[in-house]
Curated annotation (Swiss-Prot):
Catalyzes the NAD-dependent oxidation and subsequent decarboxylation of D-threonate 4-phosphate to produce dihydroxyacetone phosphate (DHAP). This is Putative D-threonate 4-phosphate dehydrogenase. Coiled coil: none annotated. Substrate binds at H141, T142, K278, R296. Its EC number is 1.1.1.408. The gene is pdxA. Belongs to the PdxA family. PdxA2 subfamily. GO terms for molecular function: metal ion binding; NAD binding; oxidoreductase activity.
């Protein structure tokens, strides 16, 4: 390696989806090489096929170790696992060989990160059904990464245009999400989110907790979750020394965070935070997985089987995920 830029590992995702295409397109962008040293973990045959789909012509430098990389615009440094029979791969279809290969790309990336060869990983889309067809018994990236890194409960943060958003609840019904707004849970997440920010090197500013009800309940007029759970949790966290305030009405808290008043927002349910970030900039909303011994960023879209193989998939999110990994990796504390 001829520079001190962070080395970012990029597993290419489900080879039947758009992952290989968005990765190939991303590595035509000078910004990526200005910020980091990217290494793909995948299959050379799949990458060559993706270049054909995208009308991109890049050299492939197959390597065994990160320090063999050239890290030069115009050349892809690739850890070639050679685990796909390209004649059997059906682009845009659920299939076991693709799910199994996608898992192996992730596993190799994690191994390299744990050994110190990679400073972070930026992941591409995988497909739950393909994983199942390939006898990979996980429902997604986060669960795979948690198991491979012995992490009990990873914490997801979204970042877009400098605004950071955490989630008190995610994949539960709205009715269930309301039941999960308890003092104990809110306090626990304030602490965990604060620790996550510190690991990323974010030390200035304070966190805001979003309200659940209209106008944060208006002193119990529109619901009492704020009075019973959110306010007591915030007050206790403040006594413990955490920089946090709220509840702030969800109709204004994200605007205030975007303007710089808060370094992050703890949203109380899935769509509250997703709508705010993705309306601001859908393609540049990037997921950062916290709480693991390795740093991971990810695009927040799927395999897009309907357009796989057409070269139409946008690489904006992938570039953003790589650049964000490069931004945080020098500050990341294991």
């Amino acid at each position: 390696m001829i520079n001190n830029k962070p080395i970012i590992g990029i597993p290419i995702g489900d080879p039947a989806g758009v992952g290989p295409e968005i990765v190939v397109k991303s590595l035509t962008e000078a910004e990526v090489y200005e910020k980091c040293n990217p290494i793909l973990i995948g299959d050379a045959k799949v990458i060559k096929q993706a270049m054909g789909f995208c009308n991109v012509n890049l050299n492939i430098n197959s390597i065994k170790k990160a320090d063999e990389g050239k890290f030069t615009l115009g050349t892809i440094d690739l850890i070639d696992l050679n685990n796909i029979d390209i004649d059997e791969l059906k682009i845009g279809k659920v299939q076991g060989i693709a799910g199994k290969a996608a898992f192996e790309y992730i596993k190799k990336s994690v191994e390299m990160a744990k050994e110190g060869e990679l400073d972070a990983i930026a992941t591409t889309p995988i497909n739950k059904e393909s994983l199942r067809e390939g006898n990979v018994n996980y429902i997604g990236h986060t669960e795979i990464l948690a198991d491979l890194t012995d992490t009990e409960d990873p914490l997801t943060m979204f970042e877009v245009r400098g605004m950071r958003v955490f989630f008190l609840t995610r994949h539960v019904s709205l009715r269930k999400a309301c039941d999960l707004v308890t003092k104990e849970r809110v306090l626990d997440y304030i602490i965990r989110c604060s620790e996550a920010l510190e690991k990323l090197g974010v030390k200035d500013g304070k966190m805001a907790v979003a309200g659940l009800n209209p106008h944060s309940g208006e002193h119990g007029l529109f619901g009492d979750e704020e009075m019973k759970a959110v306010v007591p949790a915030i007050e206790e966290a403040q006594k413990m020394g955490y920089k946090v305030e709220g509840p702030i009405g969800a109709d204004s808290v994200f605007h205030l965070a975007l303007k710089g008043r808060y370094n992050s927002v703890l949203s109380l349910y899935h769509d509250q935070g997703h709508i705010a970030t993705k309306t601001l900039d859908f393609e540049r909303t990037i997921a950062v997985t916290n709480g693991m011994p390795i740093l991971r960023t990810s695009v927040d879209h799927g395999t897009a089987f309907d357009i796989a193989g057409t070269g139409q998939a946008s690489s904006v999110s992938m570039v953003e995920a790589i650049v964000l990994a490069a931004k945080y990796s020098p500050k990341f504390k294991k």
